[in-house]
Swiss-Prot record:
EC number, as in UniProt: 3.1.2.-, 3.5.1.-, 3.5.1.124
Keywords from the named record: Cytoplasm, DNA damage, DNA repair, Hydrolase, Stress response
Comp. bias (Polar residues): 1-12
GO biological process terms, semicolon-separated: DNA repair; methylglyoxal catabolic process to D-lactate via S-lactoyl-glutathione; protein repair
SUPFAM superfamilies per UniProt: Class I glutamine amidotransferase-like (SSF52317)
Name of the featured protein: Protein/nucleic acid deglycase HchA
Localization: Cytoplasm
HAMAP family hit by this protein: Deglycase_HchA (MF_01046)
Cellular component annotations (GO), alphabetically ordered: cytoplasm
Lineage: Bacteria, Bacillati, Bacillota, Bacilli, Bacillales
Amino acid sequence: MSQDVNELSKQPTPDKAEDNAFFPSPYSLSQYTAPKTDFDGVEHKGAYKDGKWKVLMIAAEERYVLLENGKMFSTGNHPVEMLLPLHHLMEAGFDVDVATLSGYPAKLELWAMPTEDEAVITTYNKLKEKLKQPKKLADVIKNELGPDSDYLSVFIPGGHAAVVGISESEDVQKTLDWALENDRFIVTLCHGPAALLSAGLNREKSPLEGYSVCVFPDSLDEGANIEIGYLPGRLKWLVAELLTKQGLKVVNDDMTGRTLKDRKLLTGDSPLASNELGKLAVNEMLNAIQNK
């Protein structure tokens, strides 16, 4: 007989690889993860055939988030938030390049991997080599960005690791500047919009001021995520709060799978938005190609 979910521990699980570090509790994983996603098929399989346009994904390379209480949360990019949108993009015909800030391997929250979801697992296996040997973002900026770049979109997946480094990176700022100046898409979800904070780094005003976004609700990181042991403590800062201070408009205060398009910025509120955000990105990119 399977264990009753209410008997599962709400205490975060120690990560023995690091001092005072913790994975989410068994109970929180029973609430937040599942063996399958809501993937319901690809809408535009093979629709893009020219081979020029690609997606640049900026992945997280740091696993640990230091919290207010001195504990560390053992995290990474959320596999559903990364791989399900990319499944839609890759199946439509767009190639994907992976970059991290230093060129170190991307980190994933494998405890959130939907192990029975063929779309996610297939995409993970296709990208595994690139995830382990990504490009260095500074090299991409130097050699592959510019008005004639082959990248049509920049994708920043979520997972709490997105709040480490990516949110205060000059290279991320340069990448976002390039996307805005060259009319390319910026696609991100859940905690990934923390990367948008880099756009306002050392500036009086963010170029994204006035944009509307979906983001993971601060109220969950301050409340339920701690209460059920998903996080082992409070974050030092909150994504939606700081985005609001930079003049962006956060349109959600809950987690429903909502997505939003504001100009070329495409956002989703949580892992629940992964499937629809992938569809939205494909539709918008195909429309942009047709109109070029």
